[in-house]
UniProtKB/Swiss-Prot annotation:
Lineage start: Eukaryota, Viridiplantae, Streptophyta, Embryophyta, Tracheophyta
Free-text comment on this protein's domains from its UniProt entry: The reactive center loop (RCL) extends out from the body of the protein and directs binding to the target protease. The protease cleaves the serpin at the reactive site within the RCL, establishing a covalent linkage between the carboxyl group of the serpin reactive site and the serine hydroxyl of the protease. The resulting inactive serpin-protease complex is highly stable.
Name by which UniProt lists this protein: Putative serpin-Z8
InterPro entries documented for this protein: Serpin_dom (IPR023796), Serpin_fam (IPR000215), Serpin_sf (IPR036186), Serpin_sf_1 (IPR042178), Serpin_sf_2 (IPR042185)
Sorted UniProt keywords: Protease inhibitor, Serine protease inhibitor
Family: Belongs to the serpin family.
Length: 422
């Protein structure tokens, strides 16, 4: 490996770490804002939306975005998003038996300030994103419907309303949007005949009266990838991987596909205490490396009692408030934002600012798989001694993350406080 390739990989790892930090910090902030509701969002999608803003930002606004995303420059950010889109977010279709992944970023501005040609070209070439001019000032509802129609087209009608009514107005200057859909089958599907209904204890947890009755749980007698830590356990459920993707260079096509295949997994972080979710997520947010450092080892272990609830979550709305709490403020300020590399100057003297970042995610987990539009003390045993069975019973609130393991990209994240609620 030459020095240039080593430097590129170092930059890629740094931004990947920034994505993980964004994932756990957003999970913390969004969860705190809605403690009694299930949560689903795509950190990678939000990361890509902010990258689109960075492509048109300058000065302190650009510096602030880069700092939140863990990138040293716009070029590094564009390279990371492009490479991730080609690998982690590549649709491995039914033909390859891999996950179905649909990802569509887009950016819209008001007609009074059209995009600069250089920005339009950059987001198309580097992010494969649509850059569109609409009339927010005079035809706001028409603009909203146009953006939602884009989302329907981009996701094959899987996501239909990225922008709900009244989410944009005549004062809106720019909207950044992302639509993402994921459908993957478990590497080892659960047997539907083993599914049984049992109580699930909500976040207030203490008594049987607080339990949600008759929640369907998936169960299995197979070995599972489970790690036991101080105060919590982690389960990793892998999705079926696609057939190996041969390096293009071996076919004479040139280029680098960034590894031979993608490998997705869902990690469930289950606190020991029924009311321990909030504290666990705060621990994760305090140190970005926490998530990947606590993932289970590659080899499965025997399990005793094992239950994971089926669930479906649909979440949508603005993520601006949470991002402001993470220190990203200048892009959303009408007085201070510097997006001068994005749109033409209309002579008004008012700087362009990001009016909103709307985001929607849909996740469903069942027996077949998933549909989705800190110091550690580990007890080691000699290899000749079989480990004792581990119980993993997710009968109270837990956090989950869908990760593409080859790139470490956190594609989806959230928490479940009540599997009976969508």
């Amino acid at each position: 490996m030459d020095d240039g390739e080593a430097a590129r990989r170092h930059r890629h790892r740094a931004i990947s770490g920034g994505l993980t930090a964004l994932a756990v910090r957003l999970a913390d902030r969004l969860g705190a804002a809605s403690p009694g509701r299930n949560l689903a969002f795509s950190p990678l999608s939000v990361h890509a939306a902010l990258s689109l803003a960075a492509a048109g930002a300058a000065g302190g606004t650009l510096d602030e975005i880069l700092a939140v995303l863990g990138a040293a420059s716009r070029d590094d950010l564009a390279a990371f998003v492009g490479r991730t889109a080609e690998t982690a977010l590549a649709d491995r279709g039914p033909e390859s038996l891999g996950p179905r992944v649909v990802f569509a970023p887009g950016v819209w501005c008001d007609a009074a300030r059209p995009f600069k040609p250089a920005y339009r070209a950059a987001v198309a070439a580097e992010y494969n994103a649509e850059a569109t001019v609409v009339d927010f000032k005079n035809k706001v509802e028409e603009a909203r419907k146009q953006i939602n129609a884009w989302a329907r087209r981009a996701t094959g009608k899987l996501i239909t309303d990225v922008l709900p009514p009244r989410s944009v107005g005549p004062e809106t200057a720019v909207v950044l949007g992302n639509a993402i859909y994921f459908k993957g089958k478990w590497d080892r599907p659960f047997n539907e005949s083993d599914t049984e209904r049992k109580p699930f204890y909500r976040h207030d947890g203490a008594a049987a009266a607080a339990a949600v009755a008759d929640v369907p749980y998936m169960s299995s007698r197979s070995y599972q990838r489970v790690a036991v830590h101080d105060g919590f356990k982690v389960l990793k459920l892998r999705y079926r991987s696609p057939r190996l993707l041969r390096d293009k260079r071996k076919r004479g096509g040139g280029g680098d596909v960034g590894g031979e295949f993608t490998r997705y997994a869902m990690a469930i972080f289950l606190p020991d205490a029924r009311d321990g979710l909030r504290g666990l997520v705060e621990r994760m947010a305090s140190r970005p490396g926490f998530l990947h450092e606590h993932m289970p080892a590659a080899w499965p272990v025997p399990v005793g009692e094992f239950r994971v609830p089926k669930f479906k979550v649909s979440c949508g709305g603005s993520v601006v408030g949470a991002l402001e709490q993470l220190g990203l403020r200048l892009p959303f300020s009408p007085e201070l934002a510097d997006l001068s590399d994005m749109v033409e100057d209309d002579g008004s003297g008012w700087p362009l600012f990001v009016g909103d970042i709307q985001h929607k995610a849909v996740i469903e987990v069942n027996e077949e798989g998933t549909v989705a539009a800190a110091a550690t003390m580990t007890r080691m045993l000699p290899s000749g001694v079989p480990p004792p069975p581990v119980d993993f019973v997710a009968e109270h609130p837990f956090a989950y993350f869908i990760v593409e393991e080859m790139s470490s990209a956190v594609v989806f994240a959230g928490h479940i406080v009540d599997p009976s609620m969508e």
